[in-house]
């Protein structure tokens, strides 16, 4: 006798409106996916995952009860255009796709990680308090600030002009052609 079981995991899609700035908190793992619509997809319909879009700035965070539970939370963020990305409080942001933008600001704080492949004209990097940013791709110009144990791994970024400021144990690895 053969018995087949199939588990279905309910996914929840939230239409969050247009945004160009993304801020992620509370150890949430985000996968970025370029799309012709802006939405957030969660593994389940969890009211403890808060998505707030105010004036084009989308914040994704957990309710206090969910933070204390210690559960791992992953979401997919579908975006049309991004020019500002911030990871805070142990969160992570990554994508298997190349992110294209004219200007992009990336920030990683408080043990968070950002791992992206980019094609941008102007890239602003800021990392501190143990935050990590690992980037590959191209950026015509980079402005990098690393503080208080922040790390920027940008050796795989082809750049023409780069300015680096490192303070208080900050580490920056860059590749510059001019």
Language-model features: where?
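Intrinsically disordered, low-complexity terminal regions
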Residues: 1-178
